[in-house]
Amino acid sequence: MLQPKQTSWVILAGGQARRMGGKDKGFVLFQNKPLIEHALDTLTSQTDQIAINANRSIEEYSRYAVTFSDQFSEYPGPLAGMHSGLVNMNSDWVGFIPCDSPNLPNNLVSLLCNAVKEDTDIVVAHDGEYMQPVVTLMHKRIIPKIDAFLTRGDRKIILLYKECNTVFADFSDYPNAFINLNSPQELEQFGTLL
């Protein structure tokens, strides 16, 4: 069975944050703390190999953890951050969470690890109703597939998941875990819920 300490983790903070008015979401305050700190708090209680994928504010993010940018230009989406994470991290298994989900459970890493089977390429969190495509654990062997996928201009993560041996980890006991704070309205709306 894959153990959490055999994995490394990347916080995805490389997007353009258009719905947040272009503000770097990792540094948007939620409950008096930057969203990047919420993400780090989630992971540091579960694992010790943590990095950040960002395409701006690199110096600021580097104060928190090792930080690297996408290797593909023009913000091709979270898949480019995942590609960079797989290339830059040392472990065979690399996990990913978004920087704007401050309510992820404190057993996220172990639940994803427990879903890994011998031939698994990717584990994706599933909340009982929907897959959560950017809360995932990937094996490095899929790097060539992601390279080809991004090179031909594909961006939809779900299509990549269909090309790989993808399994799902059950998070149905955590109905509010995957709330994303993408806009000022969502920050306000969910501030009291979390």
Curated annotation (Swiss-Prot):
Q: Which GO terms describe its molecular function?
A: GTP binding; metal ion binding; molybdenum cofactor guanylyltransferase activity
Give the record's keywords alphabetically: Cytoplasm, GTP-binding, Magnesium, Metal-binding, Molybdenum cofactor biosynthesis, Nucleotide-binding, Transferase
Q: Which cofactor does it need?
A: Mg(2+)
Q: Where in the cell is it found?
A: Cytoplasm
**Main location (coarse class):** cytoplasm
- Amino acids binding GTP: 12-14, 25, 53, 70, 100
This entry's Enzyme Commission designation comes to: 2.7.7.77
- Which amino acid positions bind Mg(2+), per UniProt? 100
GO biological process assignments: bis(molybdopterin guanine dinucleotide)molybdenum biosynthetic process
Quote the record's domain comment. Answer: The N-terminal domain determines nucleotide recognition and specific binding, while the C-terminal domain determines the specific binding to the target protein.
Subunit notes for this chain? Monomer.
Q: Which family does it belong to?
A: Belongs to the MobA family.
Function in brief? Transfers a GMP moiety from GTP to Mo-molybdopterin (Mo-MPT) cofactor (Moco or molybdenum cofactor) to form Mo-molybdopterin guanine dinucleotide (Mo-MGD) cofactor.
Q: What is this protein called?
A: Molybdenum cofactor guanylyltransferase
UniProt organism field = Aliivibrio fischeri (strain MJ11) (Vibrio fischeri)
Gene name per UniProt: mobA
